[in-house]
């Protein structure tokens, strides 16, 4: 058999970690990226990376509690064995990064400094100022460049993924890519292809994601037969800065370091915020969620900000919706830790956030859903069976997916600082699985007939020629703006079925109009118009997966919030016995789980997405009510434990701890 070769699509943290691991195992890797790998979207990650550590362990923390926080925060929609494995690997991943030279912040004693992020009561988050993603990316790229110098890695930067190559047995044998300078289209034979292509924020027009995060690559493999899981679950980050071009993230680290979210109790109060007395400030997260305060899970913080601005009419400004994120009370030493994000705000808003509270509003930020992938559970540890060939393999043999591109780890809502852990962990753990898969093959991609690769290239050249020669009266950029506005208005923070139906109708309309959208540039050199227009067609396909999944899921779970199907808390003023109310609530919660605690699986058909539902692996932790700020939570948990739970869970009120 010829030398082993893997095609890695994407040069962010997942792609670099996977490339590094595969090269260590002696596998040749072709690393394909639309941008220089150091400009992958992972570079924008700010806040930190989670793991249990010695200090939190002394306070009662453990990998099991990290695992529990993750599935609880994800509303139990996460498959549990992969999540447990990730939590178990957390300390090892951070130790590896430390040894690779990542400049993590340290305490005066020289230990790694930690901050607390949302959805947990422990300071698990290691960080490098407010530019953690950049530091991790640079460290991993340094390792990849070492393997590049030893001819185990070839980088294809400024190359775009167009599609996979599958043989007559449906086995993935490589990828078709395009040089974004010369516009050359070529085939890259590979014994496996790994999608490490990130999220799909551009479907919503403006988001905190980079402009390359169209979801186009994921949509292409979906259209080629890969299943897509939980597409309707997208995270709307509570704190972003509105901009004319895009939305800029203000990291959760700002709240983790003591930042406070508030609005004046007087609507649209025009006074200098520093002159507004404490008694006239509404710290709504702290009042509603005294245990977690400003660090409730992101889906909850986002809905509260939306409610305060839209339903309560307490937006700071009248022309745009926003609340204050206030760091002015923090000392200069804390501001220094956050320089990375504070400088971004000052650069784009012209205001020094060290002296004046920031104005922020929620924005699309992360894709919990993604390409469906498989795994094998280790029955002894409850985690993953190391080296199992199907770990992170899609339903197409030889095609893998890792990082934000896949759907496993974060369920209905991702906890802050779990993303950097999951991306790197996935790259590392999938490497041996890919090697074992390749070793099981009877022949390599290099042995496949040339006609297989020539035919794949011809197909994509024909598609490009059709696009270049297209005529019509539509404009791709205007269509993208319409798509983004519709998706943002109707399929983000609050979702109503009538509005989602309107969105699906609009998507179909845009899809028809797209066929009449010619290129503004027919050039054969660095044609960005071609790349964008092609991606728009793929965004339209994926938008329908998202919207249809949202329409059919008649419940509220994590980031998917439908007020018409929300199970409200108890009413102590109703006169009805609280225990009886709690019992009815628990019955409704259990019935809802019986119906909807399942992953949405989309399969592409010419008529549109075909949706089915997959049971979630809950073999390690039984689901329980997600009671952040829920009225009557203590009574609900008391009844749940005594009458409904398969395994009793702790009901005492948690106390925030500091490490």
Indicate where each model-derived feature is located.
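Glycine- and aromatic-enriched mobile tails/lids
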Residues: 1-5, 18-21, 25, 36-38, ...
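Core beta-strand elements of the Rossmann-like FAD/NAD(P) dinucleotide-binding domain
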Residues: 2-4, 183-192, 395
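An anion/pyrophosphate-binding glycine-rich loop and adjacent beta-alpha core
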Residues: 220, 226-359, 433
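Conserved N-terminal glycine-rich FAD pyrophosphate-binding loop of Rossmann-like flavoproteins
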Residues: 35-69, 235, 246-249
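Conserved redox-cofactor binding core of oxidoreductases
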Residues: 93, 98-184, 196, 205, ...
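Glycine-rich Rossmann-fold phosphate-binding loop(s) that bind the pyrophosphate
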Residues: 10-13
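Short beta-strand "acidic-cap" motif of Rossmann-like dinucleotide-binding folds
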Residues: 27-33, 230
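Glycine-rich loop(s) and the adjacent beta-strand/alpha-helix scaffold that form part
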Residues: 192-248, 317, 410-433
């Amino acid at each position: 058999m010829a030398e082993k070769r893997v095609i890695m699509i994407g040069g962010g943290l997942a792609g670099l970690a996977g490339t590094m691991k595969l090269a260590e195992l002696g596998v040749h890797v072709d690393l394909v990226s639309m941008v220089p790998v150091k400009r992958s979207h992972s570079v924008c990650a700010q806040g930190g990376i989670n793991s249990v550590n010695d200090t939190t362990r002394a306070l009662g923390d453990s990998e099991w509690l990290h695992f529990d926080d993750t599935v609880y925060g994800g509303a139990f929609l996460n498959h549990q064995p992969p999540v447990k494995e990730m939590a178990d690997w957390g300390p090892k991943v951070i130790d590896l990064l430390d040894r690779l030279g990542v400049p993590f912040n340290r305490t005066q004693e020289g230990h790694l400094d930690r901050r607390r992020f949302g959805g947990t009561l422990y300071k698990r988050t290691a960080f490098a100022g407010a530019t953690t993603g950049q530091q991790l990316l640079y460290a991993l790229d340094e390792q990849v460049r070492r393997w590049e110098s030893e001819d185990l890695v070839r980088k294809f930067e400024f190359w775009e993924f167009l599609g996979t190559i599958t043989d007559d047995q449906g086995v993935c044998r490589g990828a078709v890519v395009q040089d974004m300078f010369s516009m050359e289209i070529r085939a890259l034979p590979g014994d496996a292809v790994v999608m490490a292509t990130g999220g799909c924020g551009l479907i919503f027009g403006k988001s905190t994601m980079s402009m390359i995060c169209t979801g186009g690559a994921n949509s292409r493999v979906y259209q080629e037969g890969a299943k897509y899981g939980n597409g309707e679950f997208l995270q709307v980050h509570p704190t972003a800065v509105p901009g004319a071009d895009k939305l800029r993230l203000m990291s959760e680290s700002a709240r983790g370091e003591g930042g406070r979210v508030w609005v004046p109790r007087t609507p649209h109060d025009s006074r200098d915020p520093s002159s507004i007395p404490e008694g006239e400030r509404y710290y709504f997260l702290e009042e509603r969620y005294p245990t977690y305060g400003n660090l409730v899970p992101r889906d909850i913080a986002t809905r509260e900000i939306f409610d305060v601005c839209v339903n309560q009419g307490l937006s700071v400004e009248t022309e745009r919706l926003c609340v204050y994120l206030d760091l002015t009370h923090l000392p200069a030493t804390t501001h220094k830790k956050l320089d990375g994000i504070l400088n971004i705000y000052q650069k784009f808003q012209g205001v020094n956030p060290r002296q004046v509270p920031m104005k922020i509003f929620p924005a699309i930020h992360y894709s919990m859903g993604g390409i469906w992938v498989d795994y094998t559970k280790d029955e002894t540890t409850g985690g993953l069976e190391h080296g199992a060939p199907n770990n992170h393999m899609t339903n197409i043999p030889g095609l893998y997916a890792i990082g934000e591109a896949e759907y496993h780890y974060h369920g209905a809502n991702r906890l802050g600082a779990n993303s950097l852990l999951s991306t790197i962990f996935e790259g590392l753990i999938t490497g041996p699985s890919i090697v074992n898969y390749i070793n099981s093959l009877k022949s390599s991609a290099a042995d496949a007939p040339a006609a297989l690769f020539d035919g794949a290239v011809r197909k994509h050249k024909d598609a490009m020629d059709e696009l270049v020669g297209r005529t019509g009266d539509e404009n791709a950029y205007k269509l993208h703006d319409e798509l983004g506005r519709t998706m943002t208005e109707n399929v983000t923070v609050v979702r109503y079925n009538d509005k989602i139906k309107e969105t699906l109708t609009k998507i179909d309309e845009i899809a028809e109009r797209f066929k009449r959208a010619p290129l503004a540039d027919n050039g054969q050199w660095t044609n960005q118009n071609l790349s964008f227009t092609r991606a728009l067609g793929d965004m339209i396909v994926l938008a329908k997966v998202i919207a249809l999944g949202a329409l059919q899921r008649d419940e509220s779970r994590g980031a998917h919030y439908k007020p018409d199907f929300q199970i409200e808390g108890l009413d102590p003023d109703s006169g009805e016995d609280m225990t009886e109310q709690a019992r009815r609530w628990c019955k409704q919660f259990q019935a809802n789980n019986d119906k909807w605690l399942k992953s949405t699986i989309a399969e592409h058909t010419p008529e549109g997405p075909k949706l089915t539902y997959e049971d979630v692996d809950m073999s390690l932790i039984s689901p329980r009510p997600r009671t952040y700020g829920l009225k009557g939570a203590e009574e609900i948990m008391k009844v749940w434990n005594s009458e409904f739970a398969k395994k009793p869970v702790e009901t005492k009120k948690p106390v925030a701890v500091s490490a």
